[in-house]
Amino acid sequence: KIVHDIAYLGNKEQKFDIAMLMSHGGKKSFSDIHTLGALSDTAKKSFRGTLDFLRGAVASEGAEEDTCLLLDPTVKSISLPLLLCKEDNVVGNHAASAGQIDHNKLFYIMSRGFSEVEAKHIIVESMIRPIIDRIGDETIEEAALAAVRNKI
């Protein structure tokens, strides 16, 4: 069983190139890839995820998902999820999404007294926070959360 959680926050002219390959060769293997993040300014991100079910990977499961929040119209997000399969009895899922902040969500948070900038920070942090909370070491989780807050 392999689970990969990847979070990113890109700003200015940062570029992220995320490439993942999960090869399933044994019976009842499991993999799960989650990438999520936010881009602002002119940041760019590309995600290439491949789930490869080889012969012999009977009853295996694999999933990959990429979610990107586009904070500016000048950012670029490319997602290329790929499923390869040489075995019959497997379950493979892939998904990719990119979009702007939901204006209703933004309005709701702002109606509670937060500025637009603060509301956007809350939304971005709430998106990244579940990955941070799964780290399992409180000291590292606090450092990661501080880094996220400094970045946004």
Role assignments for model-derived ranges:
Residues L106-F114, E118-P130:
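Extended amphipathic alpha-helical segments enriched in small hydrophobics
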Residues K1-F114, I135, I140-I152:
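Conserved beta-strand/loop scaffold segments within soluble protein domains that form the structured core
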